[in-house]
Curated annotation (Swiss-Prot):
This is U12-lycotoxin-Ls1a. Expressed by the venom gland. GO terms for molecular function: toxin activity. It comes from Lycosa singoriensis. Residues 19-38 form a propeptide. The keyword Glycosyltransferase does not apply.
Amino acid sequence: MKFAVILLFSLVVLTVASESVEEVRREIDIEDLPEQQRGCADLRQPCTEGDDCSCCGSEGVCNCSHPHKKGCYCKTAGPLEKLAKKFKGCKNK
């Protein structure tokens, strides 16, 4: 009888644990979304060419001239780039 109770309890625990793992897998990872759906991109993430506001925060600007990467990626802004982004009035954080 003890064996049956332990086995039943183990199956319930296993079922609950596997459901929580499936829920985590179903959640959409924000980095997997295209930049336009995220609202803004973090540093070293793809961004929209010519749009510094597509990078999150005042520290990020869109850089399309990286020597080792194709495409545009957010990078840390220099002092002048930070000022230019501030005056653009970007809405993201």
